[in-house]
Amino acid sequence: IGDMAVSDRYIFVGMYNSRINIFDRRTLQFVNAIGRSDGKWGDDIYSMTHCYGLRECGERLMVRDKNTIRGYWIYEAVTEPAFRVPWIGKVKVPEGIGYDYQPRIHGMAEHNGRMYLTDWYNKSLQVFTPSKMEIVFGEETHITSDAVFKYDAIQPLGLLSYGGELLMSVQKSGKIQRYDPETGDLLGLLAEFPDKEIGRMEIARGMLYYIDLKAGKLMKAKGE
């Protein structure tokens, strides 16, 4: 599993074999899929390589596919044949997005209709607006990123939108830091876990869940 996203009705599970499986959130029954049934890779409209990130935003499913960001209409994703679910368009990032074959070091977060992605290689956060991505007269719509927040001294890893702020972990650090989603500026320290390297994070029912990249374990900590 590369990543998961949850909407009001569906659970999206992105796999490494060029496929996104969709389940009903209430019943957990399989609904549909995006991608080839044979799991083969390719460059055409129905093929993907690896799912590095998934987030739902305004009836759109945004998929981080290695160094590409694609958008899908959720209603098409749950009704069209798996190998014929078309994407709405792509996001063009000026400097490109760095990647490798470790999806665990790539983060995505949605805040107020904008999508944020950690770019470990370029030491930055990429920012774009999914609602700009529309199908116009049957043609794809490619959009550009709204902003790129640069961080010369750190390499971003995990990312989470919570309480009107962005929470971000950095490489070789047990720190989770708070950032302003409008400017990308550092606001302060949320928490620090010595001797750990924090990857993806989630907060639920007052608990912080995170991946300790050093140990390869899912950890939890009680919030304040």
Could you tell me what each predicted segment is?
Residues 28, 69, 80-82, 123, ...:
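Short coil/turn linkers that define WD40 beta-propeller blade boundaries
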